[in-house]
Amino acid sequence: MAELTVEVRGSNGAFYKGFIKDVHEDSLTVVFENNWQPERQVPFNEVRLPPPPDIKKEISEGDEVEVYSRANDQEPCGWWLAKVRMMKGEFYVIEYAACDATYNEIVTFERLRPVNQNKTVKKNTFFKCTVDVPEDLREACANENAHKDFKKAVGACRIFYHPETTQLMILSASEATVKRVNILSDMHLRSIRTKLMLMSRNEEATKHLECTKQLAAAFHEEFVVREDLMGLAIGTHGSNIQQARKVPGVTAIELDEDTGTFRIYGESAEAVKKARGFLEFVEDFIQVPRNLVGKVIGKNGKVIQEIVDKSGVVRVRIEGDNENKLPREDGMVPFVFVGTKESIGNVQVLLEYHIAYLKEVEQLRMERLQIDEQLRQIGMGFRPSSTRGPEREKGYATDESTVSSVQGSRSYSGRGRGRRGPNYTSGYGTNSELSNPSETESERKDELSDWSLAGEDDRETRHQRDSRRRPGGRGRSVSGGRGRGGPRGGKSSISSVLKDPDSNPYSLLDNTESDQTADTDASESHHSTNRRRRSRRRRTDEDAVLMDGLTESDTASVNENGLDDSEKKPQRRNRSRRRRFRGQAEDRQPVTVADYISRAESQSRQRNLPRETLAKNKKEMAKDVIEEHGPSEKAINGPTSASGDEIPKLPRTLGEEKTKTLKEDSTQEAAVLNGVS
């Protein structure tokens, strides 16, 4: 403001020093030195500019001068007009012209100056221009030191900010200043903004430096978080950082985003450690045995989801076999978990416990399997049966062994087609051969020989017992079994022939005849039911075949009772059973060599009997036939046609071809009907 110094004329004629604050149309706003008078507007005709500072002081006697003096102690000093009366050395005697009375005073040379030649100011003496200030720069523009360089560049007398008009005021005594202000105003405001930003950063840096100095003496921790986990560490909208800052005792948390480094400062180590637990996210993996991966995951991921929920981890990932990012052991699969260090520790505890539990359960299961295997091996060697015990020493073809084998096949096999139980054997022997390994071969031969040589009465009694039990069975065959085949005990007689060639092979036919006799002795209702259920296919060696029926039809077309077969009612077949038999051609039991031998021998024996022998035993044979066939009974071998006629001659079966071959190759001894040579 020194450049805009003016002299304001007072009421007593003296000029007092003042400073221009604003320029108006016809006046100036002036502020007096030392504020001895309040700020006020002064007209142009009472204001003048001070003289140049480099003016020469040449004063002589009689010159008019201006003396720097004051009228009283309350007023400041001002320039008064006077005249030099006398000079003596450095002292001058002056006479004030403003006063009415003559007033003389001795003053020194420093208080004198030549009369100011400047006239009062006019409207064009001072130039004023304004610059609008943005809102963000108003506070900065209020400081006059911010315009120091701008003031010097434009040549302004004064630059200040007017808060009422929010403008920057530029006052100058030169018109060129206005042009320069218009050119440099934008640049000046931009520079102020840049300076303001730099100043604010410097202030923040200063504050940070002070805080750092204070925190350096306190507790702090520093850790690094991976770049891909930085989002989890910060949290949604910085929630994790805010939660860490709310921990009591935490003073500051700093984050370097470039390096992913967190710095936590606090008043205590516990507070700093607790805040670190909210921000430190890591990734770790746990090796899981490959055979337990499915059980660790659980059905629909239920087990692994429960582990994740209880531990607090963020996510879990199972590394595939094609990925080799993590080191893995043989037979192990890495489970990768992401979360805080605390949650990773929790999931390790849960997973290790669960794996130990699964291993223990697997070990118990393996022990159970070993025990079951040992039991299975022991059971294959010896299987005790409740129905057998004291009767083990009886023959193979007894009633008890037959019933036992049928019951055993029921308990182990299903009811479907072609299913055979574990007691089924395709050889010549029976189940008793497998279940009684302790018996010697000689004992078997003795038992078979005894059975084949047993009396006719004893055999008939046994077969009658068998025939009484057979009709009650649920199966389709004559025997009481549930499947298609007959009793397995029938095969023991075949095997006896093969194992003991010295015995009489024709004794097998007696069993068949005794079977037929036993069937005749049974009730008529049971017999008709069983005959209706029979099929044309031979079930076992004990059943009569179609060829046997044809052989008998050659000898006598009318049965022993004198009734023709055509007079009988046509047999009614079950359609469902007939459809059932069509698809069971593949389920036939295998035909063995013993079957061919027994069948061929029986047929050849009947055909090659001498006429004398047949005539001799005709009475006995007729007696047996009468006992076997009742008046209401149908033909034994093979069903009749619907019209009651006999079955027409069928093509030769495989048994007949076998019989023909045996006749040509070997000679057959003559035998009587009852098998006694």
Curated annotation (Swiss-Prot):
Residues 512-522 have a biased composition (Acidic residues). The modification Phosphothreonine is found at T398, T430, T512, T667. Keywords: Acetylation, Cell projection, Cytoplasm, Developmental protein, Differentiation, Isopeptide bond, Methylation, Myogenesis, Nucleus, Phosphoprotein, Repeat, RNA-binding, Spermatogenesis, Synapse, Ubl conjugation. In early embryogenesis, highest expression in somites and central nervous system. Also expressed in spinal cord, surrounding mesenchymal tissue and undifferentiated gonad. In mid-embryogenesis, most prominent in gonad and muscle tissue. Also expressed in liver, retina, telencephalon and mesencephalon. In late embryogenesis, restricted to skeletal muscle and proliferative active layers of brain. After birth, highly expressed in postmeiotic spermatids (at protein level). Expressed in neurons of the developing hippocampus. The keyword Cytoplasm applies. The modification Phosphotyrosine is found at Y68. Residues 528-538, 570-582 have a biased composition (Basic residues). The modification N-acetylalanine is found at A2. Phosphorylation at Ser-449 by PAK1 promotes its relocalization to stress granules and activity. Phosphorylated by MAPK1/ERK2, promoting subsequent phosphorylation by GSK3B. Phosphorylated by GSK3B, promoting ubiquitination and degradation by the proteasome. GO terms for molecular function: G-quadruplex RNA binding; molecular condensate scaffold activity; mRNA 3'-UTR AU-rich region binding; mRNA 3'-UTR binding; mRNA binding; protein heterodimerization activity; protein homodimerization activity; ribonucleoprotein complex binding. Homodimer (via CC domains); homodiremization is required for FXR1-network nucleation. Interacts with FMR1. Interacts with FRX2. Interacts with TDRD3. Interacts with HABP4. Interacts with CYFIP2 but not with CYFIP1. Interacts with EIF4G3; promoting translation of target mRNAs. Interacts with ELAVL1. Interacts with CEP63; inhibiting 'Lys-63'-linked ubiquitination. Interacts with PKP3; the interaction facilitates the binding of PKP3 to PKP2 mRNA. Interacts with PKP1; the interaction may facilitate the binding of PKP1 to PKP2, PKP3 and DSP mRNA. This is RNA-binding protein FXR1. It comes from Mus musculus. The lineage of its organism: Eukaryota, Metazoa, Chordata, Craniata, Vertebrata.
